[in-house]
Amino acid sequence: FDIETVKIMKNIADEYGILLKEHNCDYLNFNQISLRKKYGIDAINIAPELGVIQTNLIYTLSKYLKIDKEIEKFQKLVLKKNKWKKWNYNNENNFIKFLSAGHYHFNERLYKDIIFKINKKVDLQKMLNKNIENYLLRLFN
């Protein structure tokens, strides 16, 4: 995080009446986020981190609800598509690869079928909202 560069970029953004957003802010702690706010970053992108939260919740619920075959097929699909390479350079742990890349495949038919089966038994959206809320509360408190 280069404070001097951010100051210059913030001045330019303000001059044109636009907000300044930083990408790749996944897994920052409270102090790192506060520093960005202090120097004028208006928004941060943590979407991939939220994708990990959602993928983990889907995996956990699938195991709990005995949708094992489907989630294992989805996990294999995610690993096969290699999107995890963007996030995992030398990691050989397939579960971490799966968690980090699952969000790229939320539009797959297999994923939608899993969601349908989960929603028959629990309110997935409510659980996901609670998981994300808990994450944000931990981050900002």
Model-derived features: where do they sit?
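Alpha-helix-loop-beta-strand connector modules within alpha/beta enzyme cores
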Residues: 2-17
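Flexible, acidic glycine-rich loops studded with aromatic residues
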Residues: 14-141
